[in-house]
Structures are given as structure tokens and as C-alpha cells.
């Protein structure tokens, strides 16, 4: 059995690839490199450049690699951009998820783990918010993800497919070992933007809205370390592989921080001050949202990196590597993104593996042979 990870060259998908490798399981990665980065995929991981909306490509990967589970990360994720260009978000996040699901059903994939978002809740009337709260997304991004959730639930009811929907809160940090971090061109994540400003890659940063009904007037968010989130995906998949029922799960720590609190924490970790400018509210931003993740913890998931300064420290270490060019990825420049290539790698790793005689929780794959071959997708 093998896992297919869409968007595996991106921030969260890439860290999930590392989590699988850390436990001895080698996934297959599919990414179109529109925002992902080829260098984020470790050597030895089979990697295909292509579109999740290409049903025939996905079906070939499923059949050729005996895929039993798909972890679907590939998506557009910027809320203001979704307001400005909603049809592009419905195409990439909803229509292409439909196509991917069709290929999964045709290929008899048993398990589907979906990357969703707390944006489906909109501006909840109370926090921490649980999975039973009525969804009321404020943006096309949130609605595109909620539509995909509905499709997945209906597909599971009709076909032999079980799912886990993971609703992320605000993802932050970087691999503690320094192997990977956030490298997306034009990323809008608060901690990344603040660190880029601290490192003088930006001349200033903006705080969008200071009149929200929160203690200091800025938005409050629940920040979850990307490595803890990656392990949440493994816990969800193990639950499904062990015969567990389909689930919808919040992914957060249950503690909120305001934008000002996060910026002040970045200043302390980076030991530098930087310019902050006030800007109007952005469309689609709720005032405050914090997770109740009790259901995820029932699957055995336990946060290991639940500490805001530590998240910032890990992200800071990564940003310094990017600045120094020591990450192997480098800083993408406007108009010259290193992630913009769309060609198929001329040579790729082919890994033959076998599952050991253990349960799904202790599955270990062994690499018998690594051959360099050219594999054409078209």
C-alpha cells in the first residue's frame, strides 16, 4: 500500500512527506509546482509534475503504484485573492477536487485525507469552535473548501471510500531539524511576513484592521506548528487504515494570539524592531477563531510543539537559511520563481518497497533498489 500526496512540494504537504519518511513510509508526490518547490521533495521520493485535475494522470499513478490513500493538499489558499478572483478558486479547489475524487473512485482508492480550513466556520459566535458548529464561510476560499467537503461526504456515502477532513487553523513554524520551511513566493502567513520584515527582506509590514472586537483590536488566531499538523495527517490516515469511520477534525491548539501579540513575539525572537503600518481590514477575515481539537486528540494525536516562541524560532531559523542561500531552495524573486518550472523531471527515483508483518501503525517500507529512469506522463 502506498500514499499519494498532492501538493507534496508545498509547505504543509512537504512537511507531511517528511513525517512519512521519518516513520519509514515512502509516499508518491504529485505537484504542478505552481507554488510548490521541486527542492522541497527529498531524494528517493517518487515525484511527478502534473495537475491534480488531470484525471487520467492520477488514475495511472493510482494503478501503477498501488495507491491505497490520497492526501490532498494541492489548493489555492489566499483569502483576499479568492475575493478578487473567486472563479479561479472554485476551479482549483472545488472542480479539481471533484476530478481527483473521480479518479480515486475509479482506481478503488480506499482512504482520502482532505486538507480543509477553519475558514469554513466564518466568524463563529463562540470559541473554541468544534466540528459541530454550523459552517458559514466569509470568503470564496472558505466556500470552495466547504463545497469540496460536501462532495467528499457524498462520495463516501455512495462509494467504497472513507475520508478524514482536517480543518486547519493557522499553520506556522518549520521543520525543527531545519530540513524544510515556508518557501512560497508571496506567502501571506503572518509569522513569515513578520520574519521577512525582521530580516530586512521587506521594508515594513502591515496590520490589516485594528478595530476588531478583540482585546487589542487585531484579529485573534490559533497557531499550529506545521510538524504537529503533519503528524495529525498520519494519525488520521492510521485511523482510516485501522478500519475507523470517516471523520471531520479540527487541527489547532485551543489557544489564540492576536496579530499584535504575534508581531511582538517575532520581535523578541529575532531581537530586532521593524516598521509596522496600519491598513484597513481585509475582506473575508473573521475577528477571532480558536480550535477545539478534542476529536483529533481522541485519535492519539498529541501536540509536541505547542509553543508560539518555539514556532517562531523554527521559522526564523528557516528564514535565515533562505536569506543565506543555505536551504538548497533559496529566496524566490518576483518574476523568477524557482517553483515556476512545469517540466517533468528527466530522471526520477523508482523505489520498490514491501510492507512488514505489522499493523498499519508500525508499517515500515524498505527501499530495495533505486534506479534512475525517465518516465513520461503525457
What do the PLM-derived regions correspond to, one by one?
Residues 161, 176-177, 206-207:
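Oxidoreductase cofactor-interface core, primarily capturing Rossmann-like NAD(P)-dependent enzymes
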Residues 90, 138-146, 180-192, 222-223:
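Short-chain dehydrogenase/reductase
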Amino acid at each position: 500500500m502506498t500514499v499519494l500526496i498532492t501538493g507534496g512540494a508545498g509547505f504543509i504537504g512537504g512537511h507531511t512527506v517528511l513525517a512519512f519518511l521519518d516513520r519509514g513510509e515512502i509516499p508518491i508526490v504529485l505537484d504542478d509546482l505552481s507554488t510548490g518547490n521541486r527542492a522541497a521533495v527529498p531524494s528517493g521520493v517518487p515525484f511527478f509534475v502534473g495537475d491534480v485535475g488531470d484525471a487520467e494522470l492520477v488514475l495511472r499513478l493510482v494503478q501503477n503504484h498501488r495507491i491505497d490513500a490520497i492526501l490532498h493538499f494541492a489548493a489555492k489558499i489566499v483569502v483576499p485573492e479568492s475575493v478578487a478572483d473567486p472563479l479561479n478558486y472554485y476551479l482549483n479547489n472545488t472542480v479539481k477536487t471533484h476530478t481527483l475524487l473521480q479518479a480515486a473512485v475509479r482506481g478503488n482508492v480506499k482512504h482520502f485525507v482532505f486538507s480543509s480550513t477553519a475558514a469554513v466556520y466564518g466568524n463563529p459566535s463562540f470559541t473554541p469552535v468544534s466540528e459541530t458548529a454550523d459552517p458559514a464561510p466569509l470568503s470564496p476560499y472558505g466556500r470552495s473548501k466547504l463545497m469540496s467537503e460536501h462532495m467528499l461526504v457524498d462520495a463516501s456515502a455512495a462509494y467504497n471510500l472513507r475520508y478524514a477532513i482536517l480543518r486547519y487553523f493557522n499553520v506556522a513554524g518549520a521543520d525543527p531539524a531545519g530540513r524544510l520551511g515556508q518557501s512560497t513566493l508571496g506567502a501571506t502567513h503572518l509569522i513569515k511576513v513578520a520574519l521577512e520584515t525582521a530580516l530586512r527582506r521587506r521594508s515594513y509590514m502591515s496590520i490589516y484592521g485594528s478595530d476588531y472586537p478583540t482585546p487589542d483590536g487585531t484579529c485573534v488566531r490559533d497557531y499550529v506548528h506545521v510538524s504537529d499538523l503533519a503528524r495529525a495527517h498520519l494519525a488520521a490516515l492510521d485511523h482510516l487504515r485501522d478500519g475507523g469511520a470517516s471523520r471531520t477534525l479540527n487541527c489547532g491548539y485551543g489557544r489564540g494570539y492576536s496579530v499584535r501579540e504575534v508581531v511582538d513575539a517575532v520581535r523578541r525572537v529575532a531581537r530586532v524592531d521593524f516598521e509596522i503600518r496600519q491598513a484597513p481590514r481585509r475582506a473575508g477575515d473573521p475577528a477571532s477563531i480558536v480550535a477545539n481539537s478534542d476529536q483529533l486528540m481522541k485519535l492519539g494525536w498529541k501536540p509536541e510543539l505547542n509553543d508560539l516562541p518555539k514556532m517562531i524560532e523554527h521559522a526564523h531559523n528557516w528564514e535565515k537559511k533562505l536569506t543565506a542561500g543555505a536551504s538548497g531552495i533559496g529566496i524566490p524573486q518576483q518574476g523568477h520563481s524557482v517553483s515556476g518550472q512545469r517540466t517533468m523531471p528527466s530522471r526520477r527515483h523508482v523505489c520498490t518497497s514491501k510492507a512488514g508483518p505489522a499493523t498499519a501503525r508500525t508499517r515500515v517500507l524498505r527501499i530495495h533498489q533505486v534506479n534512475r529512469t525517465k518516465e513520461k506522463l503525457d
